[in-house]
Amino acid sequence: MPEVVDTCSLASPATVCRTKHLHLRCSVDFTRRALTGVAALTIQSQEDNLRSLILDTKDLTIEKVVINGQEVKYALGEKQSYKGSPMEISLPIALSKNQEVVIEISFETSPKSSALQWLTPEQTSGKEHPYLFSQCQAIHCRAFLPCQDTPSVKLTYTAEVSVPKELVALMSAIRDGEAPDPADPSRKIYKFSQKVPIPCYLIALVVGALESRKIGPRTLVWSEKEQVDKSAYEFSETESMLKIAEDLGGPYVWGQYDRLVLPPSFSYGGMENPCLTFVTPTLLAGDKSLSNVIAHEISHTWTGNLVTNKTWDHFWLNEGHTVYLERHICGRLFGEKFRHFHALGGWGELQNTVKTLGETQAFTKLVVDLTDTDPDVAYSSVPYEKGFALLFHLEQLLGGPEVFLGFLKAYVEKFSYKSITTDDWKNFLFSHFKDKVDILNQVDWDAWLYSPGLPPIKPNYDMTLTNACIALSQRWITAKEKDLNTFSATDLKDLSSHQVNEFLAQVLQRAPLPLGHVKRMQEVYNCNAINNSEIRFRWLRLCIQSKWEEAIPLALKMATEQGRMKFTRPLFKDLAAFDKSHDQAIQTYHAHKASMHPVTAMLVGKDLKVE
């Protein structure tokens, strides 16, 4: 088979050379919004007579490159939009196969680095200190430091980070001590060590006025002090989830499992940075009801971080398996009917995405072709939910959950510490179920893996918990004006917050509702008072799509006071599509753009067609 090419990276591929280790020494400068330092990369040649190699960089200033104490020649190529600039380094002596070299690169990041968000004190909860966090997935590590920015290469790392002494630095690694900075008494150096090889998109850094609370034998929760106790309460189920995940996936090899609650501008629900999962504060519902995101990030420990997609074309391997594990964890905690309820909710999300993107759109394929496509632009629920649907369908074909979990555990064991493609996964599936090949051959693999739109087959779902949501949503969708007085607050009294959310998701699929219906819904259910972010998001979308002008300020507020793209992008799109809020949406975007995460700002700008 021909070697798989990572079209998202400009660096020498893993067949030419591989980064084995990074030692990072850097200083965080909040005034200049820059990281300045040295990345010492241990690189192993994969071929004989290697005379030069190429690394990924993006908006980095390179001061010098040193090998064995001697400065060496390097050349930065032209910037190629989202891919950045290739950096070619000439080696002083040719390397033979398996020979290693340590390349020390002195670099500085740009204030507009797409990997970093610099927050002013006003953008934090404490309002006193600045804050910095990184988000390298998918291809932003190159805007943090020079690297082979591809998930096909895995490396260990150590780091020493100098920060103002009143702040705390954390990384996706084990904390390895702190000491005053000998070069500057107003600063402190934090040390880190990650002994498990990881793809560089999992390198992460945060610096802020952080505090921690212990919530389990291997877990601290970190945040600004204003959120730390609330976070400790919200995530108290972490250890029981970790234990279930170990039962399903195998031993937890990373030592510590800490969690960081970020400021509201963080773009994702969570990011599975090893030893330190990053999560959005929109999970702080007050009742632990959004803990499925926690189960998701815990599951990534095995599927994503141990077994990794070789290129971003195969992103579904990371996300589909992780959603599958996440739902099993929740099923173990809350029952099999709950697992099916969330699985069916996920099918609904997939339907929405396919409808939004279009059923022939290439990004609705499970395996995508990202040649000349920024992975951030291709990002959607498809790799998560179409991936999950395939695994759920296979579970039902091959003998049920226990049988398929046996496959999953074997899959993790087989491919741990490796990066793989869909073909590797499929070949292993066929060898694991060699006595059921006739069943596997009945699967329409081409339709599932390589065709756009919804999957060829919808799995079977237990409807127990979903039926009440469908029944209530149907009452609203079919109600005439004269029926509106038949609704009352008691409609929701037997529904969990998960079911209220699903009820709104069902109504939203049929939006718009007549304006009188939405006003009546507010009257009887007081939806505006609900703080659960998932429910609030769907409620406000329903209001805007049904053209309720009074909801405009509430929707603008939610779109801007947090930056989780799952919420912010659809809210802005809905506001821009409503004539009464179109101009305001664009004005609000321009007013907030400078304080938004760089990736969020770019994608919302594209959505609004102003960038």
UniProtKB/Swiss-Prot annotation:
<protein>
    <recommendedName>
        <fullName>Leukotriene A-4 hydrolase</fullName>
        <ecNumber>3.3.2.6</ecNumber>
        <ecNumber>3.4.11.4</ecNumber>
    </recommendedName>
</protein>
<keyword id="KW-0862">Zinc</keyword>
<keyword id="KW-0597">Phosphoprotein</keyword>
<feature type="binding site">
    <location>
        <begin position="564"/>
        <end position="566"/>
    </location>
    <ligand>
        <name>a peptide</name>
    </ligand>
</feature>
<keyword id="KW-0479">Metal-binding</keyword>
<feature type="site" description="Covalently modified during suicide inhibition by leukotrienes">
    <location>
        <position position="379"/>
    </location>
</feature>
<dbReference type="InterPro" id="IPR001930">
    <property type="entry name" value="Peptidase_M1"/>
</dbReference>
<feature type="modified residue" description="N6-acetyllysine">
    <location>
        <position position="573"/>
    </location>
</feature>
<comment type="subunit">
    <text>Monomer.</text>
</comment>
<dbReference type="GO" id="GO:0004177">
    <property type="term" value="F:aminopeptidase activity"/>
</dbReference>
<dbReference type="Pfam" id="PF17900">
    <property type="entry name" value="Peptidase_M1_N"/>
</dbReference>
<comment type="pathway">
    <text>Lipid metabolism; leukotriene B4 biosynthesis.</text>
</comment>
<feature type="modified residue" description="N6-acetyllysine">
    <location>
        <position position="73"/>
    </location>
</feature>
<feature type="active site" description="Proton donor">
    <location>
        <position position="384"/>
    </location>
</feature>
<dbReference type="GO" id="GO:0005634">
    <property type="term" value="C:nucleus"/>
</dbReference>
<keyword id="KW-0963">Cytoplasm</keyword>
<dbReference type="InterPro" id="IPR012777">
    <property type="entry name" value="LTA4H"/>
</dbReference>
<dbReference type="GO" id="GO:0005829">
    <property type="term" value="C:cytosol"/>
</dbReference>
<keyword id="KW-0434">Leukotriene biosynthesis</keyword>
<feature type="binding site">
    <location>
        <position position="300"/>
    </location>
    <ligand>
        <name>Zn(2+)</name>
    </ligand>
</feature>
<dbReference type="InterPro" id="IPR034015">
    <property type="entry name" value="M1_LTA4H"/>
</dbReference>
<keyword id="KW-0007">Acetylation</keyword>
<keyword id="KW-0378">Hydrolase</keyword>
<dbReference type="GO" id="GO:0006508">
    <property type="term" value="P:proteolysis"/>
</dbReference>
<keyword id="KW-0645">Protease</keyword>
<feature type="binding site">
    <location>
        <begin position="267"/>
        <end position="272"/>
    </location>
    <ligand>
        <name>a peptide</name>
    </ligand>
</feature>
<dbReference type="Pfam" id="PF01433">
    <property type="entry name" value="Peptidase_M1"/>
</dbReference>
<dbReference type="InterPro" id="IPR015211">
    <property type="entry name" value="Peptidase_M1_C"/>
</dbReference>
<keyword id="KW-0482">Metalloprotease</keyword>
<feature type="binding site">
    <location>
        <position position="319"/>
    </location>
    <ligand>
        <name>Zn(2+)</name>
    </ligand>
</feature>
<feature type="modified residue" description="N6-acetyllysine">
    <location>
        <position position="414"/>
    </location>
</feature>
<dbReference type="InterPro" id="IPR042097">
    <property type="entry name" value="Aminopeptidase_N-like_N_sf"/>
</dbReference>
<dbReference type="GO" id="GO:0019370">
    <property type="term" value="P:leukotriene biosynthetic process"/>
</dbReference>
<dbReference type="GO" id="GO:0008237">
    <property type="term" value="F:metallopeptidase activity"/>
</dbReference>
<feature type="binding site">
    <location>
        <begin position="135"/>
        <end position="137"/>
    </location>
    <ligand>
        <name>a peptide</name>
    </ligand>
</feature>
<feature type="site" description="Essential for epoxide hydrolase activity, but not for aminopeptidase activity">
    <location>
        <position position="376"/>
    </location>
</feature>
<comment type="similarity">
    <text>Belongs to the peptidase M1 family.</text>
</comment>
<dbReference type="Pfam" id="PF09127">
    <property type="entry name" value="Leuk-A4-hydro_C"/>
</dbReference>
<dbReference type="GO" id="GO:0004301">
    <property type="term" value="F:epoxide hydrolase activity"/>
</dbReference>
<dbReference type="InterPro" id="IPR049980">
    <property type="entry name" value="LTA4H_cat"/>
</dbReference>
<feature type="binding site">
    <location>
        <position position="296"/>
    </location>
    <ligand>
        <name>Zn(2+)</name>
    </ligand>
</feature>
<dbReference type="InterPro" id="IPR016024">
    <property type="entry name" value="ARM-type_fold"/>
</dbReference>
